[in-house]
């Protein structure tokens, strides 16, 4: 299972706020999560998505398209993928691994 760190950057918006665009992306992600294809977590600066690599690419394409559906003509998307294949990793397991090292 892979984990993607994705930031969608709508360019040319009428206001500096992008929360409406973020909400649109979250709605798309909720649909994929309801289908059992991904898990995701919104953070203040990006969205983390966990799933099979092929599903991640499909999801990323769908959320990249969302601002265009609102009439924008330019979108920049930053993607970082952690695809570890020697063992199963999840969003939670990565945090648990760090927390183990923090225990006295």
Curated annotation (Swiss-Prot):
Belongs to the UPF0045 family. It comes from Bacillus subtilis (strain 168). Pfam families: Thiamine_BP. InterPro entries: MTH1187/YkoF-like, Thiamine_BP, UPF0045_domain. It comes from the Bacteria. SUPFAM superfamilies: MTH1187/YkoF-like. This is UPF0045 protein YqgV.
